[in-house]
């Protein structure tokens, strides 16, 4: 469906932090970064990150030299998003940035 078009981008800061987590948490090498959505009730859908094996319904992308799995049903909700990593005195974590919209913390 999307061919070589990547639905999301991952900042260098976020990619570095993802690699650190994979190393320190001993994530198996056959796992990739799963990006998706969960929920959808009154609060709406929440964006999520995790590590997982590839599933039959996944599309596979190489983004910032990371293997990324996105369920085909979630791809349209993620188009144009950027994953960044924030670290300051008040907060530390991954953010989903959607140009033109408010920042969503995941």
Indicate residue ranges for each PLM-predicted region:
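Generic secondary-structure microfeatures
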Residues: 22, 37-39, 74
């Amino acid at each position: 469906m999307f061919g070589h078009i990547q639905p999301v981008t991952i900042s260098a800061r976020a990619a570095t932090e993802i690699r650190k987590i994979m190393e320190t948490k001993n994530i198996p090498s056959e796992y990739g970064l799963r990006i998706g959505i969960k929920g959808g009730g009154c609060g709406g859908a929440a964006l999520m990150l995790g590590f997982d094996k590839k599933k039959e319904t996944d599309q596979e992308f190489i983004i910032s030299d990371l293997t990324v799995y996105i369920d085909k049903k979630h791809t349209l909700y993620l188009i144009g998003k950027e994953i960044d990593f924030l670290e300051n005195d008040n907060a530390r974590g991954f953010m989903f940035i959607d140009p033109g919209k408010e920042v969503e913390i995941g």
